[in-house]
Amino acid sequence: MSERGNRKTQVGVVVSDKMDKTAVVKVDRLVKHPVYNKYIKRSAKYKAHDMDNAAKIGDRVLIVETRPLSKDKRWKIRQIIESKG
C-alpha cells in the first residue's frame, strides 16, 4: 500500500454551523499588491465536513482537503484549535 499524498491544510474561523454535519469556514490570506507593494487581506469561504457537529460559530479550526463529499464540500474539519464558547 502506498501513502496518500500531502493534503492541503488551512486555518479559519467558523462563520455558520446551521447545516447538519457541515460548517462554513472563512479562511483569510494576505496578498501583495503588484504595483503598490501593500498587503491586502483576501478571504474565501469553504464548506467543511463536521461529523459530530462539534464546531460552533467563532471557533478557530484546522481544515484538511479530502475527496468530494457533495457538490460543494471538499474539506473536513480535523481539529478545533480555539473554542469561542
Curated annotation (Swiss-Prot):
A Gene Ontology cellular-component term: cytosolic small ribosomal subunit
Matching SUPFAM superfamilies: Nucleic acid-binding proteins
Keyword presence, Ribonucleoprotein: yes
SUBUNIT field: Part of the 30S ribosomal subunit.
Protein family (similarity comment): Belongs to the universal ribosomal protein uS17 family.
Function: One of the primary rRNA binding proteins, it binds specifically to the 5'-end of 16S ribosomal RNA.
Record protein name field: Small ribosomal subunit protein uS17
Organism expressing this protein natively: Citrifermentans bemidjiense (strain ATCC BAA-1014 / DSM 16622 / JCM 12645 / Bem)
